[in-house]
Amino acid sequence: MCKEIEGQKLFGSAIILAGGRSSRMGFDKQFIEINEKRLIEITAGRLAQIFDEIIIVTNRPEMHSCCQYKLTSDIIKGKGPLGGIHAGLLAAESEFVFAIACDMPYINLDYIEHMKCVVESSIKAGEDIDACITLKGEWIEPFNAFYRKSLVKSIEEHLESDKRAVYSLLKQLNTTYISEFEARRFSPDWSMFFNMNTMEELRQYSQVTQEEKPNGKVEIL
């Protein structure tokens, strides 16, 4: 595990983007339950092993009233994932903030620690880094990634110009990319980037969960 650079709180905050239209799934994915516990809370608990601050970005905070984690909502409404990242960065305390979506059930802590090391190495080398992103071929993986808190202004300007794509923003930034080859050393099947968009994908994940825990079940609220 990498150590923090002296005098700087580089890491410590993680944001989970919850909700969205979920048109292909047919319901709000932030309310999926696995083994009688919300998937988003399972994700938060896993991340809490290596982060001091967990922030859930949700458009329905009243549905998380019993949640032990910090809640926030989009400041700039209706802008998709980038609006959620913006809200999470505003609420976060650390300089670099880990971001993941609520429908990504496979949390790879070893890879997160590896990304921290990549960020630290870049800083120690004197590089100005705004984000640490994984590539799959020529495509980017915008989640399971780190973003710098100071990007808030850049994101606001990007959204104000009616641009919502994370990729178009990253092209303007000092982005450090991790290759697919390197990332697959930690997740050969790419499961750490798997997200559930359809009922079939939910059933597949349910089946895996039930195989791991015979009494496992998936519930949709």
From Swiss-Prot:
As for what it does, the entry says: Transfers a GMP moiety from GTP to Mo-molybdopterin (Mo-MPT) cofactor (Moco or molybdenum cofactor) to form Mo-molybdopterin guanine dinucleotide (Mo-MGD) cofactor.
Q: Where in or outside the cell?
A: Cytoplasm
Name by which UniProt lists this protein = Probable molybdenum cofactor guanylyltransferase
Instruction: Give the encoding gene's name.
Output: mobA
Q: Which organism is it from?
A: Peptoclostridium acidaminophilum (Eubacterium acidaminophilum)
Q: Which residues bind GTP?
A: 17-19, 29, 74, 103
Task: Give this protein's Gene Ontology molecular function annotations.
Answer: GTP binding; metal ion binding; molybdenum cofactor guanylyltransferase activity
The record's comment on protein family reads: Belongs to the MobA family.
Tell me which cofactor or cofactors this protein depends on: Mg(2+)
